[in-house]
Protein backbone atom coordinates (compact mmCIF):
# COMPACT_ATOMS: atom_id res chain seq x y z
CA UNK A 1 0.00 0.00 0.00
CA UNK A 2 2.90 2.35 0.73
CA UNK A 3 4.04 2.00 -2.88
CA UNK A 4 0.57 2.87 -4.18
CA UNK A 5 0.28 5.84 -1.83
CA UNK A 6 3.69 7.13 -2.92
CA UNK A 7 2.71 6.85 -6.58
CA UNK A 8 -0.61 8.57 -5.98
CA UNK A 9 1.10 11.37 -4.07
CA UNK A 10 3.50 11.91 -6.96
CA UNK A 11 0.58 12.15 -9.36
CA UNK A 12 -1.29 14.53 -7.06
CA UNK A 13 1.66 16.90 -7.15
CA UNK A 14 1.08 17.30 -10.89
CA UNK A 15 -2.44 18.62 -10.32
CA UNK A 16 -2.98 22.16 -9.08
CA UNK A 17 -5.80 22.92 -6.66
CA UNK A 18 -7.82 25.08 -9.02
CA UNK A 19 -10.40 24.80 -11.76
CA UNK A 20 -9.01 23.81 -15.14
CA UNK A 21 -10.41 24.70 -18.53
CA UNK A 22 -11.60 21.63 -20.39
CA UNK A 23 -8.81 21.87 -22.98
CA UNK A 24 -6.12 22.16 -20.31
CA UNK A 25 -7.61 19.33 -18.26
CA UNK A 26 -7.70 16.96 -21.24
CA UNK A 27 -4.01 17.59 -21.83
CA UNK A 28 -3.06 17.30 -18.16
CA UNK A 29 -5.01 14.10 -17.51
CA UNK A 30 -2.88 12.25 -20.08
CA UNK A 31 0.21 13.11 -18.01
CA UNK A 32 -1.26 11.24 -15.03
CA UNK A 33 -0.86 7.80 -16.61
CA UNK A 34 0.77 5.42 -14.13
CA UNK A 35 -0.78 1.99 -14.69
CA UNK A 36 0.51 -0.65 -17.08
CA UNK A 37 -2.89 -0.91 -18.77
CA UNK A 38 -4.73 1.62 -20.93
CA UNK A 39 -6.59 3.51 -18.20
CA UNK A 40 -10.08 4.87 -18.79
CA UNK A 41 -10.69 8.60 -18.75
CA UNK A 42 -13.63 9.25 -16.45
CA UNK A 43 -15.79 12.31 -15.91
CA UNK A 44 -17.74 12.92 -12.73
CA UNK A 45 -20.50 15.51 -12.40
CA UNK A 46 -22.66 16.76 -9.58
CA UNK A 47 -25.97 18.20 -10.76
CA UNK A 48 -28.30 20.53 -8.92
CA UNK A 49 -31.33 18.26 -9.31
CA UNK A 50 -33.53 16.26 -6.97
CA UNK A 51 -33.99 12.77 -8.47
CA UNK A 52 -36.81 12.10 -6.01
CA UNK A 53 -38.93 14.10 -8.45
CA UNK A 54 -39.55 12.09 -11.62
CA UNK A 55 -38.98 15.08 -13.89
CA UNK A 56 -35.51 15.60 -12.40
CA UNK A 57 -34.28 12.03 -12.89
CA UNK A 58 -31.56 12.55 -15.50
CA UNK A 59 -31.08 9.35 -17.47
CA UNK A 60 -30.18 8.59 -21.06
CA UNK A 61 -27.45 7.67 -23.51
CA UNK A 62 -25.08 9.43 -25.87
CA UNK A 63 -22.77 8.18 -28.61
CA UNK A 64 -19.26 9.58 -28.17
CA UNK A 65 -17.71 10.81 -31.44
CA UNK A 66 -14.43 9.00 -30.82
CA UNK A 67 -15.82 5.93 -29.10
CA UNK A 68 -14.94 4.63 -25.65
CA UNK A 69 -11.91 2.58 -26.56
CA UNK A 70 -13.63 -0.53 -25.26
CA UNK A 71 -14.73 -3.64 -27.14
CA UNK A 72 -18.43 -4.00 -26.34
CA UNK A 73 -20.33 -7.27 -26.58
CA UNK A 74 -24.00 -6.77 -27.43
CA UNK A 75 -26.92 -9.15 -26.89
CA UNK A 76 -30.35 -8.65 -28.45
CA UNK A 77 -33.76 -10.04 -27.55
CA UNK A 78 -35.77 -10.11 -30.78
CA UNK A 79 -38.00 -12.25 -32.98
CA UNK A 80 -38.33 -12.95 -36.69
CA UNK A 81 -36.94 -10.34 -39.04
CA UNK A 82 -35.69 -8.19 -36.15
CA UNK A 83 -33.58 -11.09 -34.95
CA UNK A 84 -32.04 -11.30 -38.41
CA UNK A 85 -31.44 -7.54 -38.43
CA UNK A 86 -29.63 -7.78 -35.10
CA UNK A 87 -27.35 -10.50 -36.46
CA UNK A 88 -26.63 -8.48 -39.58
CA UNK A 89 -25.79 -5.42 -37.47
CA UNK A 90 -23.12 -7.38 -35.63
CA UNK A 91 -24.81 -8.37 -32.38
CA UNK A 92 -22.72 -10.95 -30.51
CA UNK A 93 -25.68 -12.82 -29.00
CA UNK A 94 -29.27 -12.95 -30.26
CA UNK A 95 -32.36 -14.85 -29.21
CA UNK A 96 -35.58 -14.73 -27.22
CA UNK A 97 -36.72 -17.58 -24.98
CA UNK A 98 -33.41 -19.38 -25.50
CA UNK A 99 -31.49 -16.25 -24.53
CA UNK A 100 -33.56 -15.92 -21.35
CA UNK A 101 -32.75 -19.53 -20.48
CA UNK A 102 -29.05 -18.89 -21.03
CA UNK A 103 -29.18 -15.85 -18.72
CA UNK A 104 -30.99 -17.89 -16.06
CA UNK A 105 -28.18 -20.44 -16.33
CA UNK A 106 -25.64 -17.71 -15.63
CA UNK A 107 -24.38 -17.24 -19.17
CA UNK A 108 -24.09 -13.45 -19.26
CA UNK A 109 -21.31 -12.89 -21.78
CA UNK A 110 -22.35 -9.42 -22.94
CA UNK A 111 -21.98 -5.80 -21.86
CA UNK A 112 -25.15 -4.28 -23.35
CA UNK A 113 -28.59 -5.81 -23.73
CA UNK A 114 -31.09 -4.56 -26.31
CA UNK A 115 -34.69 -5.73 -26.70
CA UNK A 116 -37.58 -5.11 -29.04
CA UNK A 117 -40.77 -4.07 -27.20
CA UNK A 118 -42.52 -7.35 -28.02
CA UNK A 119 -39.78 -9.26 -26.18
CA UNK A 120 -39.95 -7.30 -22.93
CA UNK A 121 -42.26 -9.92 -21.43
CA UNK A 122 -39.50 -12.47 -21.90
CA UNK A 123 -36.86 -10.06 -20.59
CA UNK A 124 -38.99 -9.48 -17.50
CA UNK A 125 -38.57 -13.13 -16.53
CA UNK A 126 -34.86 -12.53 -15.96
CA UNK A 127 -35.21 -8.97 -14.69
CA UNK A 128 -34.02 -9.92 -11.21
CA UNK A 129 -30.77 -11.11 -12.71
CA UNK A 130 -30.29 -8.24 -15.16
CA UNK A 131 -31.36 -5.36 -12.91
CA UNK A 132 -28.58 -5.56 -10.30
CA UNK A 133 -26.01 -5.83 -13.10
CA UNK A 134 -27.29 -2.68 -14.80
CA UNK A 135 -28.22 -4.64 -17.93
CA UNK A 136 -32.00 -4.19 -17.99
CA UNK A 137 -33.09 -2.63 -21.31
CA UNK A 138 -34.76 0.78 -21.01
CA UNK A 139 -36.41 3.06 -23.60
CA UNK A 140 -34.60 6.10 -22.14
CA UNK A 141 -31.23 4.62 -23.03
CA UNK A 142 -32.36 3.46 -26.46
CA UNK A 143 -32.10 -0.21 -25.56
CA UNK A 144 -35.82 -0.95 -25.92
CA UNK A 145 -36.48 -0.27 -29.59
CA UNK A 146 -37.64 -1.71 -32.88
CA UNK A 147 -34.63 -0.14 -34.60
CA UNK A 148 -32.22 -2.86 -33.52
CA UNK A 149 -29.73 -1.99 -36.25
CA UNK A 150 -29.22 1.53 -34.91
CA UNK A 151 -29.17 0.30 -31.31
CA UNK A 152 -26.47 -2.28 -32.03
CA UNK A 153 -24.43 0.20 -34.06
CA UNK A 154 -24.67 2.79 -31.28
CA UNK A 155 -23.64 0.30 -28.60
CA UNK A 156 -20.72 -0.90 -30.69
CA UNK A 157 -19.80 2.62 -31.78
CA UNK A 158 -19.16 4.26 -28.44
CA UNK A 159 -22.48 4.81 -26.73
CA UNK A 160 -22.38 5.48 -23.00
CA UNK A 161 -25.36 5.54 -20.68
CA UNK A 162 -25.76 7.92 -17.78
CA UNK A 163 -27.98 8.13 -14.74
CA UNK A 164 -27.93 10.54 -11.83
CA UNK A 165 -27.89 8.99 -8.35
CA UNK A 166 -29.98 10.14 -5.40
CA UNK A 167 -27.38 12.77 -4.48
CA UNK A 168 -27.19 14.25 -7.96
CA UNK A 169 -23.92 12.55 -8.92
CA UNK A 170 -23.12 10.79 -12.17
CA UNK A 171 -19.97 9.48 -13.80
CA UNK A 172 -19.00 7.91 -17.09
CA UNK A 173 -15.97 6.67 -18.99
CA UNK A 174 -15.32 9.00 -21.92
CA UNK A 175 -12.27 7.43 -23.52
CA UNK A 176 -8.83 6.01 -22.84
CA UNK A 177 -5.57 7.65 -21.82
CA UNK A 178 -4.17 6.50 -25.17
CA UNK A 179 -6.59 8.89 -26.92
CA UNK A 180 -5.29 12.28 -28.00
CA UNK A 181 -6.19 15.26 -25.82
CA UNK A 182 -8.43 16.55 -28.62
CA UNK A 183 -10.29 13.22 -28.89
CA UNK A 184 -10.87 13.19 -25.14
CA UNK A 185 -12.09 16.80 -25.27
CA UNK A 186 -14.53 16.03 -28.10
CA UNK A 187 -15.94 13.08 -26.16
CA UNK A 188 -16.36 15.13 -22.99
CA UNK A 189 -18.10 17.88 -24.95
CA UNK A 190 -20.52 15.37 -26.47
CA UNK A 191 -21.27 13.87 -23.06
CA UNK A 192 -21.76 17.23 -21.34
CA UNK A 193 -23.89 18.53 -24.22
CA UNK A 194 -26.25 15.60 -23.68
CA UNK A 195 -26.43 16.33 -19.96
CA UNK A 196 -27.13 20.02 -20.60
CA UNK A 197 -29.83 19.12 -23.11
CA UNK A 198 -31.46 16.91 -20.48
CA UNK A 199 -31.67 19.76 -17.94
CA UNK A 200 -35.16 19.75 -16.42
CA UNK A 201 -37.18 22.94 -16.76
CA UNK A 202 -37.81 22.71 -13.02
CA UNK A 203 -34.11 22.70 -12.11
CA UNK A 204 -33.18 25.92 -10.33
CA UNK A 205 -29.85 27.68 -9.89
CA UNK A 206 -26.51 26.45 -11.18
CA UNK A 207 -27.14 23.15 -13.00
CA UNK A 208 -23.63 21.64 -12.91
CA UNK A 209 -22.32 22.37 -9.44
CA UNK A 210 -19.08 20.38 -9.59
CA UNK A 211 -17.16 18.51 -12.27
CA UNK A 212 -13.91 16.60 -12.48
CA UNK A 213 -11.96 14.39 -14.86
CA UNK A 214 -9.54 11.62 -13.93
CA UNK A 215 -7.97 8.35 -14.99
CA UNK A 216 -8.84 4.98 -13.48
CA UNK A 217 -5.99 5.27 -10.98
CA UNK A 218 -5.27 9.00 -10.80
CA UNK A 219 -6.28 12.01 -8.73
CA UNK A 220 -9.10 14.17 -10.07
CA UNK A 221 -8.67 17.37 -12.04
CA UNK A 222 -11.36 19.90 -11.16
CA UNK A 223 -13.12 21.33 -14.21
CA UNK A 224 -14.56 24.80 -14.71
CA UNK A 225 -18.25 24.00 -14.27
CA UNK A 226 -19.31 27.37 -15.69
CA UNK A 227 -17.53 26.53 -18.97
CA UNK A 228 -19.23 23.13 -19.08
CA UNK A 229 -22.69 24.65 -18.69
CA UNK A 230 -22.11 26.61 -21.92
CA UNK A 231 -21.45 23.48 -24.00
CA UNK A 232 -24.21 22.71 -26.48
UniProtKB/Swiss-Prot annotation:
Function description: Binds directly to 23S rRNA. The L1 stalk is quite mobile in the ribosome, and is involved in E site tRNA release.
UniProt keyword list: Repressor, Ribonucleoprotein, Ribosomal protein, RNA-binding, rRNA-binding, Translation regulation, tRNA-binding
Assembly, per entry: Part of the 50S ribosomal subunit.
Native organism taxonomy: Bacteria, Pseudomonadati, Campylobacterota, Epsilonproteobacteria, Campylobacterales
Gene Ontology molecular functions: rRNA binding; structural constituent of ribosome; tRNA binding
GO cellular component, one term: cytosolic large ribosomal subunit
Name of this protein: Large ribosomal subunit protein uL1
Entry-linked Gene3D superfamilies: 3.30.190.20, 3.40.50.790
Gene: rplA
Signal peptide (residue range): none
Gene source species: Aliarcobacter butzleri (strain RM4018) (Arcobacter butzleri)
PROSITE patterns: RIBOSOMAL_L1
UniProt record similarity statement: Belongs to the universal ribosomal protein uL1 family.
Amino acid sequence: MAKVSKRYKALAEKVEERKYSLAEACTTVRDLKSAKFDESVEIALNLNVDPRHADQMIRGAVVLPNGTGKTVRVAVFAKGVKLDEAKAAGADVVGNDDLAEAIQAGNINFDVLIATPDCMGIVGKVGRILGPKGLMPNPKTGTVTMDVTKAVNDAKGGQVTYRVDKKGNMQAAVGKVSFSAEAIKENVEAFVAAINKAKPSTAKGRYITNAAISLTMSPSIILDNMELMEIR
